Amino acid sequence: MCIRDSSCTLADIAPHIFPLAALDGTAARVETYLREKGVELRFNAGAAAIGKRPDGGYTAAFTDGSALDADLIVLCVGTRTNLPFLIPGQINVNRGIVVDDHMRASVPGVYAAGDCCEGNNLQSGQTQVIGLWERAGTQGRTAGANLAGENAVCDGGMVQNITHFFDMDFISVGDKRLSGESVSFTGQGGRLYIEAVVEAGQIRCVNLLGGHRISGVIRSRLWKTARGSARGLSPEEIGLLRREDVPEGFITLLGGSGL
């Protein structure tokens, strides 16, 4: 809408942009970027009511007491499990159906996969709904194989987020809720921004702005770390990171040294 010179406002009940994925420094940069593009941002302002005006437009009222007139309103809601058909207490349910690594629910013979279930978060060790297509596919194959009498295992997943807007890519890998020290790096003349949470020398979560070419290396590294199989970066991986002007300090944190 902003590209077409229309006034655009993004309102969110959350305190900042991408609340489940963006670290503080990354969120601040994204918000500055959006405002520079002409997007008005309102946070801590969830939609309370939407009314139609006599002229055909609409008025949105927000939970912070403010209101906004608009010609077009788009209401966006994230993933939510749809489980009203289950009798309360019949099966173990949190935000989703809780399953083990065979995708078995708490009732024998019942399996669940995809957005309706809570699988293992490899980093936290807790069950969590991880609404990703790749995870849903793996969970579905595991559940199907076990229903057919096999012994398949899905050890878990990792929280990830990839969003493209205007000419910017935002990528998050890892669980931002995990404790640690926040560190940041810039490269490519400021076009690349990296923010990471580090605990005991291990990266727990990474935010990238403008770094889609290096996201695969980072994702692979965090997956291996979560599974306890991480080793040093390969020469090819280090070469890719250096070609993309990734700071040496971050390469070292990832496990690249001596080359």
Placement of each model-derived feature along the sequence:
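FAD-site-proximal beta/loop scaffold in flavoenzymes
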Residues: 67-142
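Hydrophobic/aromatic beta-strand patches that form the interior of the parallel beta-sheet core
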Residues: 9-11, 42, 74, 111-113, ...
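Hydrophobic alpha-helical segments, especially N-terminal targeting/anchoring helices
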Residues: 11, 52, 61, 99, ...
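Conserved beta-strand-loop-beta-strand element in the redox core of flavoprotein oxidoreductases
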Residues: 51-67
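Mid-to-C-terminal Rossmann-like scaffold of FAD/NAD(P)H-dependent oxidoreductases
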Residues: 116-214
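Conserved beta-strand segments of alpha/beta enzyme cores
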Residues: 7, 40-41, 59, 92, ...
